[in-house]
Amino acid sequence: EMVNMDDVPVLAIATGHNEMLSNSNMASFVDMMESQNFQVVTFDMLTEEIPEDTQVLMIATPTTDYSAEEMDKLRTFLNDETREEPVSVMVTCYPTQGQMPNLTAFLEEWGVSPQAGLVAETDSGNMVVSDSTGVLVTPTDEILENNSYDRLVSYYSAPLEVLFEANADISTYELWTTSDSCYVITEDTTEEEAADPETA
């Protein structure tokens, strides 16, 4: 397959934290990114530098926390004003991933706070078949207007809280949202609460 680009953008997937997502279980995602002309590479955040020309850096559901030094690497990557092309960090979370104070503090600097629990849907029209954890999410009109992302399914998702919309030169916004008929299941949720959940 020919790629008609001078510089192929790089998607760099960070490793070294017993990630739940890896090359072995996200081959379809990697194939999709490569079909969009990304070069997909992996690297160890602790022992290696972020690969040159990385445009998207993915933190793929780690199960152990990042060190302060690794977080500083991420900040340097995002604050590099010598780069012409925009850069992004994509973080995936799991509902039971546990406490990660360094990674959580970094995300909160950018206006996002991962919450405990599992997002579930009560409206059968907004879920896949009869799986309440297979939630259909809605693109936000102002960001993804005129797009083709209207049938996106989010499985086993952790809820995220947006802490602010603007803070100094940082803007935070939602790309996709769940419906008002969703609720969050936590380890403290009783059977009675699950049978008659409080929704938004």
Outline where the language-model segments fall:
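Short, surface-exposed patches at the edges or C-terminal ends of soluble domains, predominantly
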Residues: E1-A200
